[in-house]
Swiss-Prot record:
Subunit structure: Component of the mitochondrial ribosome large subunit (39S) which comprises a 16S rRNA and about 50 distinct proteins.
GO CC annotations on file: cytosol; mitochondrial inner membrane; mitochondrial large ribosomal subunit; mitochondrion
Compartment annotation: Mitochondrion
Name of protein: Large ribosomal subunit protein mL50
NAD found in the keyword field: no
Chief location of this protein within or outside the cell: mitochondrion
Length: 159
């Protein structure tokens, strides 16, 4: 096929000559030439996570005596300076507010709410009830060893 094809069109008695290009030449005009892509160097900034994953085994936790005042002051930081009289009935429907509250309490008290209990934290009262329960770092077998056993019963770990 030739590079140029001359077509003759008869229009109103005139003879027109139009140069027609090949398909490749026709479509190459509309294509934009691709510019080489230059990769920019981006400096990575590493941020420390807000809440570090707790260890696999739970640590012992004893609720502090001033737990209610700590919780109230932390809620004031998260929600604002003024709290209603029934601040324990405040709903935790907002996910961001719930996260800030629980993350701050986990850092301050050293005891995090496990993932399996997060859906149960609907109100501030639920959070207060969770943090009022002491946690022991012993298994049932450790408690049996430490308890006063009868002389005919002995637990040996190495067998």
């Amino acid at each position: 096929m030739a590079a140029l094809i001359v077509s003759r069109l008869a229009r109103r008695g005139w003879l027109w000559k139009l140069p027609l290009a090949t398909r490749r030449e026709f479509w190459s005009r509309s294509r934009k030439e691709k510019e080489p892509v230059v990769a920019e160097t981006v400096e990575e900034v590493k941020k420390e996570p807000v809440l570090v994953c707790p260890p696999l085994r739970s640590r012992a936790y004893t609720p502090p005596s001033d737990l209610q005042s700590r919780l109230e002051s932390h809620i004031k930081e998260v929600l604002g300076s003024s709290l209603p009289n029934n601040w324990q009935d405040i709903s935790l429907d907002d996910g961001h507010m719930k996260f800030r509250l629980l993350a701050g309490l986990a850092d301050g008290l050293g005891h995090a709410v496990p993932n399996s209990r997060l859906h149960q934290m609907c109100r501030v009262r639920d959070v207060l009830d969770f943090y009022n329960v002491p946690v022991q770092d012993k298994s049932k077998f450790d408690e049996l060893v430490a308890s006063n056993l009868p002389p005919n019963l002995k637990i040996s770990w190495s067998y």
